[in-house]
A protein has these predicted regions:
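Cytoplasmic membrane-interface "Motif A"-like loop-to-helix N-cap segments
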Residues: 74-85, 291-303
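Cytoplasmic helix-loop-helix junction between adjacent transmembrane helices
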Residues: 108-146
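Symmetry-related core transmembrane helices of the 12-TM Major Facilitator Superfamily/SLC fold
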Residues: 180-202
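Helix-to-loop junctions at the C-terminal end of transmembrane segments
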Residues: 64-76, 281-295
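Extracytoplasmic
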Residues: 13-45, 68, 154, 249-254
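C-terminal ends and interior cores of transmembrane alpha-helices
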Residues: 86-100, 304-306
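Flexible cytoplasmic inter-helical loops of multi-pass small-molecule transporters
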Residues: 201-222
């Protein structure tokens, strides 16, 4: 069988996977990460309330992860990914209206469903097929490294949009002016998510029939039970959870820059976006090396570094 890496148009497919893989999280995660002080101010939130929103998101996402994998076994990834992007973008329209805290909790629960249930399993499966049997490390390196580049680029672009629509200097701009400028950032982000969904739906290649077969849903549920009995699966879970705990710590960099270093909102947003540029560089370099050596070694080094 011909390796999917070598098939015509595979570069377009991985590019769309990279775009969708990061833009799907742009509204619920990247904007609060890059614009943390601004996000708290314009939505009149404190850190506990924002953390509660993420908890609502995480709870819904956890349930979606469990059942979403079954859905990805039965439908073409491109359709699942596109639908997820469309519904996620609609949530951005609600966010741009500056809803109440109660509505924000509903919105984050909604995003926990739209960004994971139909999306995550489909993206992982499509990436695995793209990489073939001998290039899994490269495939996921390009995916995660590319996602990091997209996040950094969108963060920087968001900062430019925010500063461009401020009618006064950031220090003299009042809350209403900041909210209006940030609204454009939200709407632009929503448009980019929707546009990516359109591109995925019409331009991403279909997976080969013999590589992605539709499976009976009952068999899929049975497979979940079987997989959970494998010890290495639980070790992988621990690795992923621990890695994300370390990753989430970096979310407060922009808030630290604002409250401790006394940077203004534009400068703190720049701090939040600039840190994202390290992600693509490290991901690609490590994964290219990991394909030729033991990946366990790099996991150990990573945790020691953190």
């Amino acid at each position: 069988m011909k390796d999917p890496l070598l098939k015509k148009g595979s570069f377009l497919s991985i590019t769309l996977l990279i775009l969708s893989g990061e833009l799907i999280f742009l509204l619920p995660y990247v904007l609060p990460r890059v614009f943390r002080p601004t996000f708290l101010e314009v939505f009149n939130l404190n850190n506990l309330q924002l953390g509660s929103l993420f908890s609502v998101y995480g709870t819904m996402a956890l349930l979606s992860y469990v059942y979403g994998g079954v859905i990805s076994d039965r439908f073409q990834p491109k359709k699942l990914i596109a639908v997820s992007l469309f519904f996620t973008a609609l949530g951005g329209v609600v966010l741009a209206g500056y809803p109440s805290y109660f509505i924000l909790k509903i919105l984050y629960g909604y995003w926990g469903f739209t960004t994971v249930f139909l999306f995550w399993g489909a993206m992982i499966k499509a990436t695995r097929v793209w990489g073939g049997s001998k290039n899994q490390g490269k495939a996921f390196a390009f995916l995660d490294g590319g996602r990091g580049l997209v996040a950094a680029s969108m963060g920087s672009l968001g900062v430019l949009i925010f500063s461009a629509f401020l009618t006064h200097d950031i220090e003299s701009a009042n809350l209403i002016e900041r909210k209006e400028a940030f609204r454009y950032v939200i709407l632009f982000s929503s448009f980019m998510v929707f546009l990516t969904g359109f591109l995925v739906l019409f331009f991403m290649e279909k997976d080969q029939k013999d590589e992605l077969k539709k499976t009976n849903s009952l068999n899929s549920y049975s497979n979940i039970k079987t997989v959970l009995k494998i010890q290495s699966v639980w070790l992988i879970m621990i690795i992923i959870i621990s890695a994300y705990m370390g990753y989430k710590v970096t979310d407060i960099y922009s808030l630290y820059a604002s409250e401790v270093m006394l940077f203004d909102h534009i400068q703190t947003a720049n701090i939040g976006s600039l840190q994202l540029y390290l992600r693509p560089l490290v991901c690609v370099i490590i994964a290219l090396i990991a394909d030729k050596t033991s990946y366990i070694y790099f996991i150990i080094i990573g945790f020691i570094t953190m």
